[in-house]
């Protein structure tokens, strides 16, 4: 009947509109994907995540050389992630703070805060403080206060002592800054309750002594 034809025609129109909307959403999502990937890559670069993985490895080494560990595999994995995140926040602050001197060096002139692919606003510092605080709290939840304090010491050493207080003023900046890696080892040993065991202490000292000649 005419009514059925009209209803069928109406359904067809609705179907076509829904299809067009679905295609529009799909194309819009596709167009945003490269931008999302680019932003992730920029944040990865700004946070010095590769260095963060080395710091994380130091924590795992601290756990490995400790005489015993009450931590489960999941707790070790979680602690490693929290150390990586905390290290990356101090790395990002380092690049934000040094963007003026980074701009005049060939090796660093393409960093995201220099090129302003990431706008160097103070909002970044707020987020970095929040993320650092969350990483510290999470570390406390999965381990103990001592490990958390060592992690804070590492963040503070690299982010403030090395970046703000020393780097522009003395050649000793690398020497003192090397403590950040040593603290990472102690995070691992403290999490197992073996901070003052000989092996992790020796490893932290060796790492401290290795850092200056490695960078020089």
Where are these regions (language model features)?
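Acidic (Asp/Glu-rich) catalytic motifs at the cytosolic membrane interface
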Residues: 87-114, 212-216
């Amino acid at each position: 009947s005419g009514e059925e034809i009209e209803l069928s025609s109406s359904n067809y129109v609705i179907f076509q509109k829904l299809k067009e909307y679905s295609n529009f959403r799909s194309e819009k999502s596709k167009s945003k994907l490269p931008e999302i990937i680019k932003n992730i890559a920029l944040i990865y670069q700004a946070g010095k995540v590769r260095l963060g993985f080395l710091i994380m490895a130091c924590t795992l080494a601290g756990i490995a050389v400790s005489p015993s560990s009450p931590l489960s595999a999941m707790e070790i994995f979680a602690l490693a992630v929290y150390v990586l995140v905390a290290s990356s926040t101090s790395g990002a602050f380092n690049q934000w703070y040094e963007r003026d001197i980074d701009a005049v060096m060939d090796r660093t002139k393409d960093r995201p805060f220099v090129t302003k692919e990431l706008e160097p606003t103070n909002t970044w510092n707020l987020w970095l403080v929040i993320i650092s605080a969350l990483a510290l709290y999470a570390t406390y939840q999965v381990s103990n206060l001592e490990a958390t304090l060592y992690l804070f010491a590492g963040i503070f050493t690299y982010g403030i002592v090395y970046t703000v207080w020393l780097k522009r003023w003395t050649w000793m900046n690398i020497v003192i800054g090397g403590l950040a890696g040593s603290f990472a080892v102690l995070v691992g040993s403290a999490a197992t309750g073996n901070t003052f065991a000989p092996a992790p202490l020796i490893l932290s000292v060796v790492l401290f002594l290795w850092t200056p000649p490695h960078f020089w």
